[in-house]
């Protein structure tokens, strides 16, 4: 039997490490755009900070899950802790897509302040994948798996993989959202169609979320 502390430590590391990787890249993409914007107009510094903060939330979710794992490792299934870290960490890579969208949003706002609200709407879309990962991680950590140890292991890993890998769709969603921001900046009436296109990639994240929940209900 694997020591629970080992799997808990690995799960915590995956949560904060992978999610932090995504947030670091996403924030870097937006920050690079922000540096150019501030060079042109120093008064846009506050706006640049707001947009750069958006892809950092995934890292915070990963940090939160890591802390939770370290607090509950004595009472939760060891593989559930590992899977929770996997779910939060992989889904946190959606920050890369959010950084791409936020970078485009910042560039659009630099040209026209009136588009700020619309740019924010598109920029936050890729974060939902990370929220799905956070949700499944919390459900795993509250002890939904009781009973057969072998079934617990397989189910926990299945749920973590489902929502985690499906959460990578946030990268594609961010790319689409960035294009939609550009289209909306040119033609405000294009926002509705742009939103439809931007939410399409999220369908697969929802599939992953649903399968993860069904797996947990099946084993429970």
Swiss-Prot record:
<keyword id="KW-0067">ATP-binding</keyword>
<feature type="transmembrane region" description="Helical">
    <location>
        <begin position="155"/>
        <end position="175"/>
    </location>
</feature>
<protein>
    <recommendedName>
        <fullName>A-type ATP synthase subunit K</fullName>
    </recommendedName>
</protein>
<dbReference type="InterPro" id="IPR038662">
    <property type="entry name" value="ATP_synth_F0_csu_sf"/>
</dbReference>
<keyword id="KW-0547">Nucleotide-binding</keyword>
<keyword id="KW-0375">Hydrogen ion transport</keyword>
<keyword id="KW-0813">Transport</keyword>
<dbReference type="GO" id="GO:0005524">
    <property type="term" value="F:ATP binding"/>
</dbReference>
<dbReference type="Pfam" id="PF00137">
    <property type="entry name" value="ATP-synt_C"/>
</dbReference>
<keyword id="KW-0472">Membrane</keyword>
<dbReference type="InterPro" id="IPR035921">
    <property type="entry name" value="F/V-ATP_Csub_sf"/>
</dbReference>
<dbReference type="InterPro" id="IPR002379">
    <property type="entry name" value="ATPase_proteolipid_c-like_dom"/>
</dbReference>
<keyword id="KW-0812">Transmembrane</keyword>
<dbReference type="InterPro" id="IPR000245">
    <property type="entry name" value="ATPase_proteolipid_csu"/>
</dbReference>
<dbReference type="GO" id="GO:0008289">
    <property type="term" value="F:lipid binding"/>
</dbReference>
<keyword id="KW-0378">Hydrolase</keyword>
<keyword id="KW-1133">Transmembrane helix</keyword>
<dbReference type="GO" id="GO:0033179">
    <property type="term" value="C:proton-transporting V-type ATPase, V0 domain"/>
</dbReference>
<dbReference type="GO" id="GO:0016020">
    <property type="term" value="C:membrane"/>
</dbReference>
<dbReference type="GO" id="GO:0016787">
    <property type="term" value="F:hydrolase activity"/>
</dbReference>
<keyword id="KW-0446">Lipid-binding</keyword>
<keyword id="KW-0406">Ion transport</keyword>
<comment type="function">
    <text>Component of the A-type ATP synthase that produces ATP from ADP in the presence of a proton gradient across the membrane.</text>
</comment>
<feature type="transmembrane region" description="Helical">
    <location>
        <begin position="195"/>
        <end position="215"/>
    </location>
</feature>
<feature type="transmembrane region" description="Helical">
    <location>
        <begin position="125"/>
        <end position="145"/>
    </location>
</feature>
<comment type="similarity">
    <text>Belongs to the V-ATPase proteolipid subunit family.</text>
</comment>
<dbReference type="GO" id="GO:0005886">
    <property type="term" value="C:plasma membrane"/>
</dbReference>
<feature type="transmembrane region" description="Helical">
    <location>
        <begin position="63"/>
        <end position="83"/>
    </location>
</feature>
<dbReference type="GO" id="GO:0046961">
    <property type="term" value="F:proton-transporting ATPase activity, rotational mechanism"/>
</dbReference>
<comment type="subunit">
    <text>The A-type ATPase is composed of subunits A(3), B(3), C, D, E(1 or 2), F, H(2), I and K(x). Subunit K dimerizes and may form higher oligomers.</text>
</comment>
<feature type="transmembrane region" description="Helical">
    <location>
        <begin position="90"/>
        <end position="110"/>
    </location>
</feature>
<keyword id="KW-1003">Cell membrane</keyword>
<feature type="transmembrane region" description="Helical">
    <location>
        <begin position="5"/>
        <end position="25"/>
    </location>
</feature>
